[in-house]
Amino acid sequence: GGNTPEAAAESIKQAVAMGFNCIKTGVGLRGNGRVIETAEHTENVVAIFAAMREAVGNSVDIAIDFHGAVAPQTAKRLVKALEPYHPFFIEEPVQAQNVDVLADITRSTSIPIATGERLFTKWGFREVLEKRAASILQPDLSHAGGIMETRIIAGMAEAYYAAIAPHCPLGPIALAACIHLDASIPNFLAQEGGRITGEGYIKTPYKQVNGYLPLPTAPGLGIELDDEAIADKIGHDWQNPKAYAEDGSAIDW
């Protein structure tokens, strides 16, 4: 993505040139944490997404993540304004914990709504399915209970015609587990983490081909850790990005 239509268009062109056919972007321009953002904010967000759509056409799937950082009033406005540009799905238009509000937004649009990275085990996903609050679930295998628990979640979702798009920004081991799950369920949609190659962590890095990762064939998860390379990374300090409104108050990044 990018904070201008021009930057966003160039970014998605580069991703498509690398072979990706399903891409997720963010809202990009952070608001001020207001309950209702300005009309200008809505227009800017839509202009950026529209530029991405125009740059690659309708053959590339483009999803957009609100990160659960948008108030429901603004989320509804943004979702409606994005409809003409056919997002693949909208992720976390609001926080998933208030399932009734999420369901209200889902009912207000034809765009598929996705959620799940902050939900845990089958019990965390049950209410979302029962209330039809989302049609795409994004469990994180590292947090939601592992391969077997997430397989159960996928089975529950199948009964509600909901798809699975596992959340995975973590690393090559988590991605390997996701790939095994993806290949074993009928309602798999897309896998996050396409830019994770495992370079410097596993002996045979991932290589996507035309937007797809080949299924592992080696024993276990199908990867072998590069212990020597990993040793150089022990103690690396990574922190979440931080975002602030114009008045200096902290907002969800």
Locations of regions flagged by a protein language model:
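Metal-dependent enolase-superfamily TIM-barrel catalytic cores that perform enediolate-based chemistry
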Residues: 1-103, 108
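Extended hydrophobic packing segments that form well-structured cores
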Residues: 221-253
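Shared catalytic-loop signature of beta/alpha-barrel
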Residues: 80, 86, 97-220, 224
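Residues at secondary-structure transition points
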Residues: 34, 217, 226-228
